[in-house]
Amino acid sequence: MKENLGNTGHISRSYDEAMNEIQSKTLEMSGVVESSYVDALRGLINNESSLSQKVATNDFLVNKLEIDIDEKCNTILALQTPVATDLRTIIVILRIITDLERVGDEAEKIARLSLKLNYENIDPALLKTLEHLGNSTSTILHNSIDSYARKSVDQALEVIQTDKKIDLEFKSCMKELISYIVKLDDDKAVKNFLSISTCAKSIERIGDHAKNIAQHTIYLVKGKDIRHTSVEQVRSELDQD
């Protein structure tokens, strides 16, 4: 906001450039994180170790971007004291990069575990179930990032609604996993399936982070904190605005 910046055009331009940079960097980080998750999922389902190994490299970049964006946001807060929309933008970016970093961590965990799996002991039908859950989560992660990029409240609300379905799908997946585990009498095979269940949990958590990003987007656009509000109530309140 230019009222914070004094009277010189030079300072105003510097401020605008700084605000544009943190938003651009956030979208860059989003793209890296989304690619990491897609690679981790493909590596897990298709036993592609090269993709799983690639995720570790991306995780380093994700962490670097998070630190860079965080530092730039704090510099703006310290030197420019932004208000109104700009302040809300910075708050949202700081929240979003935290969720993105955690998505990156979960993707890295999936990749690391998949490298240790013994695929000979895994029923292909189980991998299909896991793939469906993973693809559903991939879709809402993409849509949550897109809702932020487009500042789309409707798209963000759709992400939040869809996350509930993913939670149900995760529970169904876990029941299927447990039904396999109870039939096993080999410790190595049990450990194998426990690793798969950990991957499934990571996928479900990524869906939760996607939901968070969608909630942050609504706060950015509407100034409403909806973290403890139902989608139906949010729609009703927004219709009254």
Residue positions per predicted region:
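Cytosolic, long alpha-helical scaffolding segments
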Residues: 1-241
